[in-house]
Amino acid sequence: MMQHKEIKHPYQGIKYTVLVVIAAFRVANALTTKTFFQPDEYWQSLEPAHRLAYGYGYLTWEWHEGLRSSLPPLVGAGIYKALQLLGLDDPRIVRIAPKIVMALFASAGDVYTWKLSARLQGPAEAPWALFVSLLSAFNWFFLTRTFSNSAEMVLTAVALNYWSFNGKEVNFKRLSVALFIGAISCVLRPTNAILWAVLGLHLVLTTTAKMRVLWLAVRNVALVFAATYYIDYLYYGEPVFPLLNFLKFNLLQSLAHFYGTSPTLYYFYEALPLLTVGWLPLTLWGLWINRSQVLVKAALAVVVAFSLIRHKEVRFIYPLVPILHMAAAEAITQTPKKLRKWLVWSLALVNILVAGYFSQVHQRGVVDVVEYLSTEPQVTSVGFLMPCHSTPYQSHLHRDIPVWFLTCEPPIGFTAEEQMTYRDQADQFYDDPLQFVQTQFPESVAVSAREARTPLFHPSHLAIFESLEKKSPEVIEHLVELGYKRGKTFFNSHFHDDWRREGDVVVYNL
């Protein structure tokens, strides 16, 4: 069980060779992941980092509004600068290097899930917690991607390992480390504060050293926030409070729903199965066994809190994964030995198959097309005539040439009435594709990017989804009249929840 009282045993020290194997496993994971999941993997970390290091790239509206911490792009820019100094900044290496660094960091998530299980559960459960973490389909698909949520999960796993769960036996040195790392995770994702608020309240209520715990919390959180404020000030060039701007955007202006809303119970019936995949039945059993433990209660509180927010995404509760994997490990040890081997490997196989498909097949065309455009000599300019942020950008293209895509900024500064009728640029295109291309582009392909009076121009290479060919053939006819020819195609997906992104990715070139 997830005991409040810590367990002392050999698993608290992990052999160096095991760490190397886990790190190598995650590097292989990162380098073999060929698909696209969500735009933030590129646009909120690698893209601003690329702009900072190389002087070109695109900053989305979040950066202009000061909603994001500068820590992720600063780390990325450091990687890119190192490549420059070593003379290794060719497109392929520029794409691979951040993956390797993220993979090494991600491996700490596996290690500290193991260590946390060893500390709170025991030597029987700890190896299974590591096993579940390594053979988790969602971990394989998501953990090594450059999302702030991935870093948030790793930092949460590390901080939990240092946390004091027994108020009667508080280790203040370890608690100080936990608070420091937990505060950094909140800088990356402010909503992670929900988890730490629940755990902190439990600790304060159960310890006799209340004032000392509170003082440690205030000191460490203030130290982290002061340091990151200074770093953000240097990055933005002016006083910026990303946390306050984040709260203003999501709570006061309530604009997050512009990017979609989900039913109240989404996290229970969809997100939890996505996070656990084949391990779901064991996870639910383990959570039930440990329903009285503070970590399980904290996880439930986080899910309930997120359920009250209209805009929901599975990655928002990703920091709970170590707790879910520990629950699955608990259930495995409770399974009769005669059934255990068959059950565990059957569920592991489900995870392996799901991980393979979604990391190798589903939505790979939008990544492949950018890698193709980055190396094709005849490419002098690029346009992405598809929903906004459908592909990586300069972090993968790595060519200082004119590039555009259809934008989708939210209605910031609009009245409630204006928000109801607001249509972003991508919406305007799909409302009437032919009219859009006839009115928003220069009349002739002879008009260069520099000469065009609008942000959109006729590029040498234009990427679209196959669905546009099928649903708006008149647009294709117009492109052909301008001199475009159908070129390379890239398989993207067998199915998609957005009709605009259905089918292959097709390149048209002059």
UniProtKB/Swiss-Prot annotation:
It is an enzyme of class 2 (transferase). Pfam families: Glyco_transf_22 (PF03901). The chain crosses the membrane at residues 17-37, 96-116, 123-143, 145-163, 179-199, 221-241, 269-289, 316-336, 342-362. Its EC number is 2.4.1.-. Its main location: endoplasmic reticulum. It is a multi-pass membrane protein. GO terms for biological process: GPI anchor biosynthetic process. Glycans are attached at N290. InterPro entries: GPI_mannosylTrfase. Pathway: Glycolipid biosynthesis; glycosylphosphatidylinositol-anchor biosynthesis. Mannosyltransferase involved in glycosylphosphatidylinositol-anchor biosynthesis. Transfers the third mannose to Man2-GlcN-acyl-PI during GPI precursor assembly. Belongs to the glycosyltransferase 22 family. PIGB subfamily. This is GPI mannosyltransferase 3. The lineage of its organism: Eukaryota, Fungi, Dikarya, Ascomycota, Saccharomycotina. The gene is GPI10.
